[in-house]
Amino acid sequence: MALTFPSIIEILGTLTFAISGIRLASAKRFDWFGAYVVGLITAIGGGTIRDLLLDTTAFWMLNSIYLTVTAVALLLVIIFGRYLIRLNNTFFIFDTIGLALFVVVGIQKTIAADFPFWIAIIMGTITGAAGGVLRDILINEVPLIFRKEIYAMACVFGGIVYWICYRLDYAPHLTQVLAALTVIATRIVAVKYKLSLPRLRGDEEVEESENSDREDSRQ
């Protein structure tokens, strides 16, 4: 693999996403092999789904560096695990960076395949978010993308910024950096100020609301 700017982004995204997956696996007391599998699925899951939808060979089947980078991520967690645990928001940091980088990778690869930009934004979102969905399923958690946090929408915002910069004919590197920073900034602002999308009300909440209305009417 030639070390171009997009390939560096992809490698860094693989490393950070793998660390986020392995970090959660360690919290669930997985063994080394299980942690490696979770880290690998986190790192390559979104890109694999993207490549299947784009009808191309999965990227990790063309180069073993992604398997190697995941092994490096496992080694880093094993060696520096105590420091990572002590560091506040370890998972959030690595997950957010990986999300931002993979959104850029997904958009860039889709554009290179001559798909329209709205498809590129969808593929960027899938590349960034789908690996995390698979990770959460493997560790028996509700996927982060389906909780209140703004996650997938951060990918969409990053994609829109990418499109705007692309239309304004910005340099490719600047476009990719600005799109990634948009994803990171959106996630940070959403978490800091507890911003979230509206939730659908469940049956229990509806019943509680109806009971409350009845009590109010009696009074």
What residue ranges belong to the model's regions?
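Intrinsically disordered, low-complexity non-transmembrane regions of multi-pass membrane transporters
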Residues: 1, 195-219
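The first (N-terminal) embedded transmembrane alpha-helix
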Residues: 8-20, 38-41
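Cytoplasmic-side transmembrane-helix entry/capping segments in multi-pass membrane proteins
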Residues: 33-41, 63-68, 88-99, 121-123, ...
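Ordered, amphipathic secondary-structure segments that act as subunit-interaction surfaces
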Residues: 72-109
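Short, structured motif recognition centered on aromatic/hydrophobic residues
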Residues: 37-41, 48-54, 122, 126, ...
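C-terminal ends of transmembrane helices
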Residues: 18-28, 51, 75-88, 133-143, ...
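Helix-coil boundary and interhelical linker segments in multi-pass alpha-helical membrane proteins
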Residues: 1-5, 51-61, 106-119, 164-175
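Structural signature of hydrophobic alpha-helical transmembrane segments
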Residues: 2-14, 58-72, 116-128
